[in-house]
């Protein structure tokens, strides 16, 4: 009998639970944007861009990559930093669009969505602040 020399590394969601929560939030936002093709209606010149499924797809891909990074045992600091900065940019764009729509349409749910995006953005900033910046 040959002895199996493979080492199986244990994957734990307890290592980076905030990253998993952020990744799930991004996947949720992406699904909402993909499922609703007429979510954004203002400004008129940007509606095709904002309602494109590519925007929702980017949210989903970044969310999945953040979850994958958090479950991986070879966590690279540069990858984490880049994913979190891209997330901040996406959330800032989304929150700005939500507030603009709320102002133009007067619909309170757009303001609510904008505030929720800001809260997730602040959560992202807190993760960035707590994350390692370099190898020590």
What are these regions (language model features)?
Residues 1-26:
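Cytosolic juxtamembrane helix and N-cap/initiation of the first transmembrane helix
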Residues 8-13, 72-80:
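Membrane-interface helix-boundary motifs at transmembrane edges
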Residues 16-23, 76-87:
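Membrane-interfacial loop-to-transmembrane alpha-helix junctions, especially the N-terminal start
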Residues 18-19, 43-61:
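A loop-to-helix transmembrane entry motif
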Residues 34-42, 71, 96-104:
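Juxtamembrane "helix-exit" motif on the non-cytosolic side of transmembrane helices
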Residues 59-73:
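Canonical alpha-helical transmembrane segments
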Residues 74, 78, 85, 91-113, ...:
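Membrane-helix boundary connector in multi-pass membrane proteins
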Residues 118-136:
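Membrane-water interface at the C-terminal end of transmembrane alpha helices
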């Amino acid at each position: 009998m040959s002895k199996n020399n493979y080492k199986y590394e244990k994957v734990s969601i307890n290592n980076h639970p905030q990253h998993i929560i952020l990744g799930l939030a991004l996947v949720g936002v992406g699904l909402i944007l993909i499922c609703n093709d007429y979510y954004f209606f203002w400004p008129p010149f940007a509606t095709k861009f904002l309602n494109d499924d590519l925007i929702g797809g980017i949210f989903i891909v970044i969310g999945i990559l953040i979850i994958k990074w958090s479950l991986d045992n070879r966590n690279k600091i540069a990858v984490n930093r880049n994913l979190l900065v891209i997330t901040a940019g996406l959330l800032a764009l989304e929150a700005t669009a939500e507030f603009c729509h709320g102002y133009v349409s007067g619909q309170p749910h757009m303001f609510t969505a904008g505030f929720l995006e800001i809260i997730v953005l602040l959560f992202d900033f807190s993760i960035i602040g707590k994350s390692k910046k370099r190898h020590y």
